[in-house]
């Protein structure tokens, strides 16, 4: 796995430091050990591949984490990730719990408030785990490639994603087994 090499980890640390350090007020943080690569093909809903709106907390990511989402190709219109403003995310989340909304209802409400994360290669979005985000059907003829990773602020709630397993210390790299 390329993510497990020291060379890749150093490049990832440089990238994360550049994107996140100032925005996290200089706080120390850990870095997700393995990044995710996302591929959004044209008309992906036809193939059952649309990523429903969700928040990281629903998948075990604690509120002490931040996601960094970065397109590798142009990301715009319907081929990009969609995100909801913070207050809309909080309101919909509260209603989801209070009224026991199903995924269909969550999707309908999120569509009313979502905005496209238009970005070019070299640009990134940094957001909290409580932000609702997801995809809509890619109606463009362009496949969007992106990657995402997460940082855990020192002392932050990590949910089910444990330091030392899901995260590694910034600037520390695994040594290959001999």
Regions found by a protein language model. Give the residues of each.
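Residues in well-ordered beta-strands of folded domains
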Residues: 36-40, 54, 69-71, 82-84, ...
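Catalytic core of non-heme Fe(II) oxygenases with the double-stranded beta-helix
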Residues: 47-119
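A structural signal for the main folded, soluble domain(s) of proteins
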Residues: 94, 122, 126, 154-161
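Conserved metal-binding segment of the jelly-roll/cupin
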Residues: 117-132
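Signature of the catalytic double-stranded beta-helix
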Residues: 1-46, 51-63
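Non-heme Fe(II)/2-oxoglutarate
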Residues: 136-178
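Short beta-strand segments enriched in hydrophobic/aromatic residues
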Residues: 72, 131, 151-153
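Residue-level detector of short, conserved catalytic/binding motifs and their immediate flanks
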Residues: 66, 123, 145
